[in-house]
């Protein structure tokens, strides 16, 4: 400061020198400020109008603001707050780390007002940068530079987000380093696979996957992990800890990434669109899995047969068929039917089995194994059991040999011999306890059970009609929208359902794969075959509720019911006179030809 004033005087500017303070006081205001900083705020700058130094303001004392100035008398140092301070300023002084006491002492002295056109040697601190550095939050006591801290906006913990992925960072430098990974410009690259990393430590951790190192074992089971964070995350499966709750519905999750994916269900956000169709997805993995429908890719292939799958869980479910067959070959004395419900049970993990059956008390390590086991209890009260599995039926096989069973999957109740099906009996692990029909997937069984219960959980928003499955609802909604997405490649005719297109294509190919077992007549669709078989069996399942007359086809019943209705049959489009009878009940229906 002294050198600056001397330089100004040499340039021709008139700047007064600081007056000498009395003997009891420090020699000048600058030394006084320096002693104040060295004593950590025990005394403040003493000044008054009587002996004011140039550039200093009045009313700055070592005592309280209301104490009178004692002039040249020595005053006892007291710990007092500076004038104009508010509660919390002392907290701010404690928060800021003092690196240069001399520089802070000089900042106490203001630049002379008549030299305001010159740059000040005491730069004003950037309050916004100071707020970012020390993360001042709303409600912080005190003020800084005349600005109330309670008015400052909160600063996000990680304000910088990556546009390529969903990760966020605290500063721009870390964000730029991360973005180099998307461009393949990481400073540390793995010599084995070429993957880039921002830090060498991350690359060394990654190399454990190539060497197969898993130094972190689980104390509850036999699993091992390459990172401690993965072990910590895995231990939550044993402890049941879910530390990440959803603020909207209260549902808790064991991983933060699962919480982020779940929160998109509340916001409706689907940031990943498909380039082939209009579908959007919440996760990138779901988009990749969906795109296999367009590309036809099936990356998961069975090692025991030639079948391949689009999803890994489909491959795991398919491999149960081979596992059941291998158990049968290894233990010929104890046959295990692959279509038995117990054949689909997943081996329980080592350790406790928390899922117990309420009927027999048997415990299981997986909840799905308990659900499969409980289906056995649903067969109670069915007196006619099966000799090969634990399923039962209400129908006596001796009295009705045509009753369909899981071990005769090629027949259907009341439908005669059916065509060969794509799913073999060895792949049917889920069976209906009501009719015994087998399914390859559990969700197919759940959808089939709605036929027996009459449940129709899917309602049309336009007409209110309800359906037992979502695909049926989607197909029905095309009747309102008029959409016909399935076009015939031969004639261009379009259909609302894929099954209707397949039935129509038989017209061009002349294919009639469904043959009648009685008269050997062939049909292009199974529905036509079932309708034809009513001639041989004499079945008339559609009866009129008013006259008890029965019909083999529903269309014949609808046409018959017009007789009982108020509206007469539509008149023929000709110039012939109307019939002689006038009573609608005397109308004779046209003959029916089979």
UniProtKB/Swiss-Prot annotation:
It is found in: Nucleus. Its main location: nucleus. Residues 54-64 have a biased composition (Basic and acidic residues). Residues 1-86, 313-351 are annotated as: Disordered. Transcription factor that promotes adipocyte differentiation and suppresses osteoblast differentiation in the bone marrow. Enhances the osteoclast-supporting ability of stromal cells. Binds with STAT3 the consensus sequence 5'-CTTCTGGGAAGA-3' of the acute phase response element (APRE). Transactivates several promoters including FOS, OSM and PPARG. Recruits a histone deacetylase complex. Pfam families: zf-C2H2 (PF00096). Residues 1-183 are annotated as: Interaction with STAT3. One of its GO terms (biological process) is regulation of DNA-templated transcription. Residues 31-47 have a biased composition (Polar residues). GO terms for cellular component: nucleus. There is a cross-link at residues 97, 368 (Glycyl lysine isopeptide (Lys-Gly) (interchain with G-Cter in SUMO2)). The gene is Znf467. GO terms for molecular function: DNA binding; zinc ion binding. Induction: Down-regulated by CTF1, PTH and OSM. The keyword Ubl conjugation applies. This is Zinc finger protein 467. Interacts with STAT3. Enhances STAT3 activity by keeping it in the nucleus. A zinc finger (C2H2-type) spans 160-182, 188-210, 216-238, 244-266, 272-294, 300-322, 355-377, 430-452, 458-480, 486-508, 514-536, 542-564. It comes from the Eukaryota. Belongs to the krueppel C2H2-type zinc-finger protein family. It comes from Mus musculus. Keywords: DNA-binding, Isopeptide bond, Metal-binding, Nucleus, Repeat, Transcription, Transcription regulation, Ubl conjugation, Zinc, Zinc-finger.
